[in-house]
Amino acid sequence: VGSEMCIRDRDRPVCRTIETRYFIKETMEELINLLHTGGYSCVIDNEGKIRTFTQRGVADLYDLLTREPEFLKGALIADKVVGKGAAALMILGGIKELYTDVVSSNAMDLFRTSDVKVDFVQEVPFIWNRDHTGWCPVETMCSEEESAEAILQLIRGFLERIKNKE
C-alpha cells in the first residue's frame, strides 16, 4: 500500500490497520459463504486455519475452549445461531469477531460487556429448543447468569449430564 493510500493520525500512517481490516472483512465474507453453502453450523478462522463444525448446540465450542483454547484466541467465527451459552464460550475464548444469522438478546447483552465485534441478521428474545416447544435448555440455564465464567461451569455440568445419559 502506497503512502497516498494511508490515513494519517497525528502524523502516523495507519496503513496496517486498513490492510488488516480489509483482510478481516474479506475473510469474514468467505466464512459466511462457507457457513451457508457448506451446511455447517459454525465456521472458525484463526490466522488462515479454517475449521468447520456440524454439531448443534455448544459442544464444539466447549471442546475447543477446553482442549484447544489457543485456536479461539483472536478467531473470526461465522455461526448460524448464537445464544447466551455460546456467547460466553466465545468471550472466554477471546474471539475477535462474530457473524451470526440469529442471536438472542441475552447473548447480545453478554457481548456488550466484551470486546467482541458482533454482526447479525436477526436478534431474537430467546433461542428455541430443537422441537420449538420452548426455550433452548442452555439458553434457559444461562439466562440469569451475568458472568461468562459462571456460564462455563453451567455448560460443563450440562454436557457431563448429557454424556452420562449416552
Q: What positions do the PLM features span?
A:
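Short, polar loop motifs at secondary-structure junctions
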Residues: 102-107
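Short, small-residue-biased leader/transition segments that mark boundaries at the very start
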Residues: 1-7
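Conserved mixed alpha/beta catalytic, RNA-binding, or beta-rich assembly cores of soluble enzyme
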Residues: 28-101, 123, 128-137
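C-terminal binding/interaction regions
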Residues: 108-165
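N-terminal charge/polar-biased segments
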Residues: 24-45, 50, 144-166
